[in-house]
């Protein structure tokens, strides 16, 4: 069990799983930074280690509320070479050894020769956010096995309390994934869901288990992400063309949906052709003479073109710019999650197919519509009272999506007023979530 005095002084050690800064997905990066921000809000001098499946070990520097913060990045591996110090099997073996020989000196010895063991064995608290939405098998069984089950189960084998930060739970469509999900959720200390349907989903999974209030609702942590102006912004001539009367609409195009998912065969069972839908949305918007459209990517994966937003945005820009010259603008270049949030903040209205692109807008009180491909959109918008601002592309026809966009656009002033009131309250709830993390 954690040492109480250790948790209240400058030596608090925190391990964060399911987070990464190198996936190219700005939503995942936003979740990672926001999670660390919340942890440091509770323990300002904590030593934070991100134990993930990223590219390489190292240090990552953050600027949080004007303060420079450095976190350690360690990579857990699931490859064929089971003898690597960072391999899941090696870590599991060490956990078993510590169960048999639970001596403090032995734990210190193992931690000193293997930093990956130390990250878990020496941790006072362990948190996991599962990339926000990977506690589900909709992205494939292998991904759920690693992120949804094995990483979390490993924490419990080190006899550490696991706190699941606000995320989406389910759907788990296979009996085996439901069984693994139940195994993890039963052993977690606290389970935070970022939507009310997630709370109910977990309760239903654990129907015969005494939960004692362990399942709680807290909105998505990315609402507290800091916006930061990048040194260089390339959005064409938008700022020169824009006038006081202009309405700038940000449009985030998902490369994953644009290419039909990983299978490239409408993997998410959308009811309408996504490429045609995006084109129709822009044509619909262009009826407003003062309107300008800024295409904003949110996932940068040039080596995985099926997911890459910039490639999708560029293709659509070339097609649309010919028809609407001087009214379509493209965000070019590479940006981090803070930069992209700043760029989204330049818009008056936003439409996104990446949920965290929408959150970047909403958290700055910018009215937004989510073109959804999964249930996570509905839950997050619902958490701030904007469930009507979701257009489910997997249930709605093209006409229905356009109707939802039109209603939100017409009501943007009302939505902005609503957001201005509720967003500060949402941020306070998220940051104060840490007050429940009592010393064991």
Regions found by a protein language model. Give the residues of each.
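Active-site anion-handling motifs in enzyme catalytic cores
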Residues: 1-440
């Amino acid at each position: 069990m954690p040492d109480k005095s250790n948790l209240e002084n400058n030596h608090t050690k925190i391990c964060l799983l399911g987070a990464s800064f190198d996936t190219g997905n700005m939503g995942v990066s936003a979740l990672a930074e926001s999670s660390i921000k919340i942890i440091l809000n509770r323990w300002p001098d904590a030593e934070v280690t991100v134990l993930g499946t990223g590219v390489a070990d190292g240090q990552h520097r953050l600027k949080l509320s004007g303060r420079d913060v450095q976190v350690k990045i360690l990579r857990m591996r699931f490859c064929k070479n089971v003898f690597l110090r960072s391999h899941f099997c090696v870590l599991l073996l060490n956990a078993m050894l510590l169960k048999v020989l639970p001596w403090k000196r032995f734990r210190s010895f193992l931690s000193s020769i293997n930093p990956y063991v130390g990250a878990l064995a020496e941790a006072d608290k362990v948190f996991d956010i599962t990339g926000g939405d990977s506690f589900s098998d909709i992205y494939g069984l292998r991904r759920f096995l690693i992120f949804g089950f094995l990483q979390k189960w490993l924490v419990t084998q080190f006899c550490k309390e696991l706190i699941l930060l606000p995320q989406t739970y389910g759907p788990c469509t296979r009996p085996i994934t439901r069984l693994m999900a139940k195994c993890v959720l039963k052993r977690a200390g606290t389970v935070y869901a970022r939507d009310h349907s997630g709370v109910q989903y977990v309760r239903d999974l654990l129907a015969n288990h005494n939960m004692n209030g362990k399942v709680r609702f807290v909105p998505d942590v990315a609402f507290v992400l800091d916006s930061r102006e990048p040194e260089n912004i390339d959005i064409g001539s938008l700022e020169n063309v824009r006038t006081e009367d202009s309405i700038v609409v940000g449009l985030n195009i998902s490369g994953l949906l644009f290419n039909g998912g990983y299978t490239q065969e409408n993997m998410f069972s959308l009811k309408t052709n996504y490429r045609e839908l995006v084109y129709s949305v822009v044509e619909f918007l262009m009826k407003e003479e003062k309107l300008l459209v800024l295409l904003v990517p949110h996932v940068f994966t040039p080596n995985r073109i099926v997911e890459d937003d910039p490639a999708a945005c560029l293709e659509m820009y070339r097609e649309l710019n010919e028809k609407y010259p001087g009214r379509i603008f493209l965000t070019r270049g590479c940006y981090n999650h803070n930069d992209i949030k700043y760029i989204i903040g330049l818009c008056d209205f936003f439409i996104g197919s990446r949920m965290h692109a929408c959150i970047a807008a909403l958290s700055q009180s910018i009215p937004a519509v989510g073109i959804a491909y999964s249930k996570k959109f509905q839950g997050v918008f619902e958490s701030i009272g904007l469930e009507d601002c979701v257009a489910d592309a997997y249930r709605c026809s093209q006409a229905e999506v356009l109707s939802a966009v039109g209603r939100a656009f017409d009501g943007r002033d009302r939505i902005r007023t609503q957001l201005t009131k509720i967003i500060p309250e949402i941020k306070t709830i998220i940051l104060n979530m840490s007050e429940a993390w009592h010393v064991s």
